[in-house]
Amino acid sequence: SIYHVYNMTAVAAVAKLYHIDDQVLANVLATHIVKNGRMEHFQLGDRSMFLNLAKNPVGANMTLRIMNGMNEEKELLFVLNDNIADGLDVSWIWDINFSVFQQVTRVITSGTRAYDIAVRIKCSGYSQDQIVVLPDLDAAIQELNAHPGKKFIISNYTATQPTRNALIHWISKNGGNVNEYNH
């Protein structure tokens, strides 16, 4: 995503500032692996899923833009918690631009605030018939994998690791893999 470009640009600028050898910099950039919920790719059976951490509207909007860049049917799982590390206030979800949904056939919501994010998505004009609320994460992963199409998962801070673990658990039982991309 564009954030990886920003981060790598910052790395290059600091390397130049401290006169780090160009070959060392090139090696670092070539071997950097994106993981832990940063557009991390999972293959659950024949279903391709991307997990992205979003701690604020900007992060969520970036994932939605990436989704829209893929011209095919897709589904979204949004996992929202309100634990102390997340900040108990989830009002930031009202600043997410859900009006950009294109070819999103279904949205599943999960987490401790699954109903809040479902209401937010419904208020953006998305059909209630296409929103599935499953606070239980394992049930949400199972439901997400039940239909064809590309899958995207947005999770906030404390939801990301449990979501990753649920995906890996599903893979260990049913087949698939985790693909860490070099960027």
Task: Walk through the language-model features, giving the residues of each.
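Membrane-embedded hairpin module used as a gating/binding unit in multi-pass transport
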Residues: 1-19
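ATP-dependent carboxylate-amine ligase
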Residues: 13-20, 27-183
